[in-house]
C-alpha cells in the first residue's frame, strides 16, 4: 500500500515523537508500580555495567548524566555492594567500574519484575495484537541497531 508523501512525512514525524515517549512511559509506569529500591538511573548504569566495565567518563556519556552525577551514583551502587572500582587490566593507570555478582542478581530481579509486569498486560491482548507487537519489536531492534545501539 503506497501513501502520499505528505501523509508519510506526517506519519514519520509522529513516529519519531511517539517512540521515545512510549519507551519513557513504560519505564515510568514500571517504576511507579514496582518497588525495586533503585532509581531509573541506577538501573541504567547496572544494565550498562552488565555488558562490561566502564570508565566514569564513558558511563556519563552513555547514560547522559554529568560526570559528578555518575560518580555519586556509582558511589551509591558501590556502598550497596552492586558495583566496584577496579584497575583497568589494559591500562593500570585507569580505574573502571564493574558490576558485582550482587549487582547482577539485583539487575536480574529488576528485569524479572519488569518482564512479569509486561507479561501480565500482554496476556490480555488478542492473538492479532500479540503478533503485531512481536513484529514491532523486530522493527525496533533493527532501528536500534541502525542507530548504533544494541537491542539486547
Which residues make up each language-model segment?
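N-terminal helix-turn-helix DNA-binding core of bacterial DNA-binding proteins
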Residues: 29-69, 80, 96, 152
Amino acid at each position: 500500500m503506497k501513501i502520499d508523501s505528505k501523509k508519510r512525512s506526517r506519519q514519520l514525524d509522529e513516529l519519531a515523537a511517539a517512540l521515545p515517549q512510549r519507551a519513557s512511559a513504560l519505564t515510568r509506569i514500571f517504576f511507579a508500580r514496582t518497588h525495586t529500591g533503585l532509581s531509573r538511573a541506577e538501573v541504567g548504569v547496572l544494565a550498562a555495567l552488565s555488558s562490561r566495565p566502564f570508565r566514569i567518563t564513558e558511563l556519563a556519556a552513555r547514560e547522559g548524566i554529568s560526570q559528578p552525577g555518575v560518580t555519586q551514583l556509582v558511589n551509591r551502587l558501590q556502598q550497596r555492594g552492586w558495583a566496584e572500582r577496579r584497575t583497568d587490566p589494559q591500562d593500570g593507570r585507569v580505574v573502571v567500574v564493574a558490576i558485582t555478582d550482587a549487582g547482577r542478581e539485583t539487575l536480574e530481579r529488576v528485569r524479572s519484575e519488569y518482564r512479569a509486569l509486561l507479561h501480565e498486560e500482554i496476556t490480555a491482548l488478542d492473538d492479532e495484537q500479540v503478533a503485531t507487537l512481536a513484529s514491532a519489536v523486530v522493527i525496533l531492534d533493527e532501528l536500534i541497531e541502525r542507530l548504533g545501539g544494541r537491542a539486547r
